[in-house]
Amino acid sequence: MAAAAPAAAAASSEAPAASATAEPEAGDQDSREVRVLQSLRGKICEAKNLLPYLGPHKMRDCFCTINLDQEEVYRTQVVEKSLSPFFSEEFYFEIPRTFQYLSFYVYDKNVLQRDLRIGKVAIKKEDLCNHSGKETWFSLQPVDSNSEVQGKVHLELKLNELITENGTVCQQLVVHIKACHGLPLINGQSCDPYATVSLVGPSRNDQKKTKVKKKTSNPQFNEIFYFEVTRSSSYTRKSQFQVEEEDIEKLEIRIDLWNNGNLVQDVFLGEIKVPVNVLRTDSSHQAWYLLQPRDNGNKSSKTDDLGSLRLNICYTEDYVLPSEYYGPLKTLLLKSPDVQPISASAAYILSEICRDKNDAVLPLVRLLLHHDKLVPFATAVAELDLKDTQDANTIFRGNSLATRCLDEMMKIVGGHYLKVTLKPILDEICDSSKSCEIDPIKLKEGDNVENNKENLRYYVDKLFNTIVKSSMSCPTVMCDIFYSLRQMATQRFPNDPHVQYSAVSSFVFLRFFAVAVVSPHTFHLRPHHPDAQTIRTLTLISKTIQTLGSWGSLSKSKSSFKETFMCEFFKMFQEEGYIIAVKKFLDEISSTETKESSGTSEPVHLKEGEMYKRAQGRTRIGKKNFKKRWFCLTSRELTYHKQPGSKDAIYTIPVKNILAVEKLEESSFNKKNMFQVIHTEKPLYVQANNCVEANEWIDVLCRVSRCNQNRLSFYHPSVYLNGNWLCCQETGENTLGCKPCTAGVPADIQIDIDEDRETERIYSLFTLSLLKLQKMEEACGTIAVYQGPQKEPDDYSNFVIEDSVTTFKTIQQIKSIIEKLDEPHEKYRKKRSSSAKYGSKENPIVGKAS
């Protein structure tokens, strides 16, 4: 919508107050929205046995991409000169749209020409659950037009009767090709599709063709074609609406989709075949069909020769009900920190019965953090950890529930802390080409090891000094937990003066700073993956920082490094000044003293990245109107710059002036993944690189501006061009929007937590683990009633059960709540299943109809 102040004021309104609602009956959610939320988490591990080059230089420079259908949403770093590249890159993102295939493409990087696709792994959406949480080797498949087929066609067939002038009868077949949806991208762009419609039989092949639709993956054809089916017999009333059995069985309609190549060869997009005998019992047939590869596709390719790819994939689809349904489960979980012993709490029991503790940790941490319950819960489970720790040197070094909870907490709340502390120096390291290799075996020809040592020491010193002076920026919740850890460690090992520091450093240095240094892209500190030399530099820095921060190693005469060259290098830092600085920093971040807030005076860095923006105020549509710019968002302003690192912004929008952030219809500029930032001047139209990136920008912009005054209630989903809005045809530029703005999101700009979604995830985990929950319940019952001699530990070693009676009661509560939640979920699943009729857009026909 145009951002004139009077129109904006007229469009804004206060949201009505929510009324108190009694606990709903099962099935009451029918009249309210059930949110279907998708996410993908996993790891691209490695590829092996890739095809070598034919020439003398056989090695390849490889990278891997993740694609939703054919839209790239993630890219790994380039691994140079390898036929078995080791990527080891973790990924996580929300999936904002429907998709048919999740694909992984392995590329050979080519500087002068287009990158070469070596092969791909394509997994149907419905098959993703078969690979959830498991590392699997997949054979690479060849990439050609046949393997890239995707999308669906909406088709209607009718059979009419015609009587010719000479009295013979023929059947007229009416083919209405209505639309297509989700056609593949061609070279990363929307295609120019057209369809050929053929009636095929033993002795005929009549073909017709639609018009070409420009730059769209969802063309609306709405074209009707007529085919005559002649009959040898003369017209009789008896056979008036019959087609001879031998004819109808042999005729079929074939629709082929093509991309118009103009000056180059047209590209095959897929085909469907519909036998005419679908009209045997009905004179009309209408359905959506899934596009298929050609029957004579390339079946001879030796796919085993292309190599293989090892992946770990976890796809999640949550059906989030209205908030009222989650009240009892949420209440039970939030009581967990107060349960004695903590092992009898609902949150702890969930971690015990889940196949992978990590699955339970993330939703638990986010839910408890949202309600300020994480510190007492983490303290309680850490205390349980300490009971089993016999050696102070191994304190909090394992992967227990306590350490995993704290790891996730630091990732969630520590993002801004890392940006203000590490990002400037990491930018300097990544943008520089200084060599820091000090391993004699890995030195390149011409390298000077002494110069490299000085380079490495410069970076380590600069990073170390920044970290130890950053205590004022450390988030309060981290400080609170560090304080608790320090106190508990001192009580557990009162005779060890260093344990109070190692308890804190094992988290803040080993699991926080050191990890962020070695993988800055994972923590959103860098927009792209570093090259191989930079990764090596960051690894050496990370090792040194990790050891510097480990108070235990500083109290010994020797460092903990295994490599001789690292031991020699670390001698530069074994000075009293470093020890004092570490101790002072750890004291400050584990203190309960109130800190002067530094977060409110400095803007919080939220997101940055390269996107395309449309020149404002232009009245024509054209490629030149879209410019590539570097966007930066803080808690105060949205800016864009000519390139990364530019200090002077080309354009600035204060966050307080943002009135709405909404998606823009693809038809506005014939471009995908566009959104609009509506503010007090002309709307800013932006194109993201993919749907995931667009969704992330919309979410963070909505969060940061959610509490602004005069936010819009209605907006225009298209653009104002040539004197009218394309969406509603209104002529006034300041006309009230024609579509309601989407619902708001949580207002916390640093921590975006959807508590209903997290509770739904926990419900799903309990549901998947009911068998183990039952076994735990049986174990509690056995322990409670058993009066004989003490049993071997193996009998109950699968579970931590300190108090069988309290644990049993909690399990009973969990089962009762889950059983009640099952009812609305089952009702929704049945309703969804019945609405997705075979042949509908949601459930298209695969293969030939019958």
Curated annotation (Swiss-Prot):
Low complexity bias spans: 1-24
Positions of region (Disordered): 1-32, 825-850
Record-annotated Ras-GAP domain positions: 372-589
Residue positions where N-acetylalanine is found in the record: A2
Keyword annotations of the record: Acetylation, Cytoplasm, GTPase activation, Metal-binding, Phosphoprotein, Repeat, Zinc, Zinc-finger
Residue ranges annotated for the PH domain, each copy included: 604-706
Record has Translocase as a keyword: no
Pfam family, one: C2
Gene3D superfamilies noted in UniProt: C2 domain, GTPase Activation - p120gap, domain 1, Pleckstrin-homology domain (PH domain)/Phosphotyrosine-binding domain (PTB)
Compartments where found: Cytoplasm; Cytoplasm, Perinuclear region
GO MF term list: GTPase activator activity; phospholipid binding; zinc ion binding
Zinc-finger ranges (Btk-type): 708-744
Organism domain of life: Eukaryota
Function recorded in the entry: Inhibitory regulator of the Ras-cyclic AMP pathway. Binds inositol tetrakisphosphate (IP4).
Protein name, entry field: Ras GTPase-activating protein 2
Organism of derivation: Homo sapiens
